């Protein structure tokens, strides 16, 4: 199986807490919930990092990411970060004529990535996306996050002090539901949820939003039927 999606992750229990909900509404003038756009995501990041600060005596953060110079840092942007902000065009499969990486394609061939050559890799949406990545990493994530790689940062939300993560892979699901984790209830159910990715201000209806590695799913006959049914529902969710 090489099929996974990049989605929004959040602490459902904190987002459902009446005290936190009331405090957020008083500060920002709207209800705490899954953010549809990056502006709301930033509000929530600021809320938990700055205005909440601690929950149950533990310092909490409104954002998690990674920034160490490493091959995995490339995935942070190639996995559709620029297009989530609104870089690229409407069109199948990944934006046409300008795709999710900001590369202009003509007759199935790349012809340019810069604005001067018809691309969008250094356009307003791409610049905005990069700046927000830097700003949020510095302002709202744990101090160690900029020095982490993809693999090092992935398990961090399971420690229980992260409120949300805009760039989270479903491949981390198995590591987030183990017994005894701070993000798992006593009955084994998760305290967290995932949701569709919020989009930036340059994004328009019809543009690609989010990312998935399209591969294959293998459901073994030897797997109990109830677990196979659950896996089939999960497969439909991450590919929808």
Residues of each region from the PLM?
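Periplasmic solute-binding protein
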Residues: 1-30, 42, 66-113, 206-220
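Short helices/loops that flank or line small-molecule/ion binding pockets
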Residues: 15, 40-48, 52, 151-165, ...
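Structural recognition of the beta-strand scaffold that forms the well-ordered cores
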Residues: 6-10, 62-65, 163-168, 193-196, ...
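A local structural motif
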Residues: 22-33, 116-120, 134-148, 161, ...
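Bilobed periplasmic-binding protein-like "clamshell/Venus-flytrap" ligand-binding domains
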Residues: 50-67, 240
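Extracytoplasmic/periplasmic substrate-recognition and gating elements
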Residues: 138-141, 180-240
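Glycine-centered hinge/linker elements that transmit conformational signals in sensory
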Residues: 38-49, 84-147, 197
């Amino acid at each position: 199986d090489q099929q996974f999606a990049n989605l929004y992750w959040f602490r459902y229990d904190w987002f459902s807490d009446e005290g936190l909900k009331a405090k957020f509404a008083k500060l920002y003038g709207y209800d705490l919930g899954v953010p549809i756009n990056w502006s709301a995501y930033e509000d929530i990041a600021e809320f938990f990092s700055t205005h909440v600060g601690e929950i149950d005596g533990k310092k909490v953060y409104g954002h998690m990411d990674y920034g160490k110079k490493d091959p995995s840092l490339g995935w942070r942007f190639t996995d559709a970060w620029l297009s989530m902000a609104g870089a690229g065009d409407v069109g199948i499969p990944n934006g046409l004529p300008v795709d999710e990486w900001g590369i202009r394609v003509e007759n199935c061939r790349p012809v340019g990535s810069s604005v001067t050559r018809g691309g969008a890799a250094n356009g307003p949406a791409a610049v905005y996306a990069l700046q927000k990545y830097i700003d949020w990493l510095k302002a709202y994530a744990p101090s160690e996050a900029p020095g982490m790689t993809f693999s090092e940062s992935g398990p961090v939300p399971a420690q229980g002090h992260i409120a949300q993560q805009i760039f989270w892979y479903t491949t981390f699901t198995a590591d987030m539901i183990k017994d005894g984790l701070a993000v798992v209830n006593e009955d084994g159910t998760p305290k967290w949820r995932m949701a569709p990715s919020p989009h930036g201000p340059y994004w328009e209806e019809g543009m690609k939003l989010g990312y998935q590695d399209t591969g294959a799913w293998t459901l073994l006959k030897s797997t109990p039927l109830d677990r196979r049914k659950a896996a089939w529902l999960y497969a439909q969710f991450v590919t929808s």
